[in-house]
Amino acid sequence: MNAHRDKLPGQNAPIFQCDTEIRVCYGDTDAMGVVYYGTYPRFYEISRTEMLRYYGIIYKEVEEKGMILPVRSIQINYLKPAYYDELLRVRSFMEEIPAVRFIIKTEIYNSQNELINHGEVVLISTNQQTGRAMRSPAWLLEKLQSVSTAS
């Protein structure tokens, strides 16, 4: 995990952040040897899952407690291509503790440390039984508060 990061204009400082390395495999690419555009949401998911895990929030345990986090929206900006066998650094971060919406921003850097892709995924705290949006439960907020004040 990298604790420092330069802010882009209009961004708040992240309170949760984690970098994950992903090597582009053959199945991630198209016939031209570049990462297929539809692969990036999977990279985002791997990175945000690892970020939440780093801070002690494990999806499986969240689901066992009756909450799910479906994707409400995803926005992706493609700046440069990534290639087969390239090692990418995928950085996910949150700028605020979520009440209902988890807004997770993601940046992908190539092996030359150039920003090649960035975007945002919005997850909604949802009651697993009813399928309705819910406020993040106290246990989750307490966990997030404790790690945000510790960093």
Protein language model regions, located:
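A short, structured loop/turn motif at beta-sheet edges
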Residues: 11-13, 110-114
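Conserved GNAT-family N-acetyltransferase fold
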Residues: 44, 106, 119
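Hydrophobic beta-strand-centered segment that forms part of the acyl-chain substrate-binding groove
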Residues: 51-102, 116, 124
